[in-house]
Amino acid sequence: RWLLYGALVSAALVGSGKMSIAIGADQASCGSGADWPLWQAFVERHIQSDGRVIDHATERLHSTSEGQSYAMVFALIAHDRTRFEQLWRWSVANLLGNRLGTQLPAWQWGRRDDGSWGVIDANSASDADLWFVYALAEAGRLWQQPQYTQDALTMLELIVADEVVDLPGLGPMLLPGRSGFATIPQQ
């Protein structure tokens, strides 16, 4: 019961600057990711210049909120600010439809059945949503970018509103996504 609130409160505290989480290397020693060959290989293979992370293992060459958010964490660790911004901007434009503050990111984007490109599944994925919050909060703190911190807090509010339910006998629980997941009826 308190684990969920602990995680959400921790993310909020990180975002507000009241708590910090070590990334594993300080900013000065990270450079721009050029000294992390595996990050560079991932970027070259999976990330388009506009910030879209492509899953080449899928027929639709789709992108997911998980791929975008995990890549943002790796960009943060690599201190690759340019790539981080590209990843976030692509996510906001395509997974959020430029509606940060009113919806959570769609979990899947790619080639639709009719051949057009766009959101394939608009449902959210709470694991990715929390990684977005973490990456944004830490980027706001490390790079002194208050807009990232604000974006993290905005997403956190939506996570609590859209993905947390009160389960009788258990208390607040984080669902895997915004819709399509059964909960125990209230008695």
Say what each PLM segment does.
Residues 5, 13-66, 76-119, 169, ...:
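Low-complexity, Ser/Thr/Pro/Gly-enriched N-terminal "stalk/linker" regions
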Residues 11-14, 137:
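Residue-level signal for alpha-helical transmembrane segments in multi-pass membrane proteins
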Residues 67-83, 90-93, 130-145:
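Well-ordered alpha-helical scaffold segments within catalytic/enzyme domains
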Residues 87, 101-143, 148:
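Long, hydrophobic/aromatic-enriched structural stretches that serve as scaffold segments
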Residues 137-187:
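Aromatic- and glycine-enriched pocket-lining scaffold segments that form the walls
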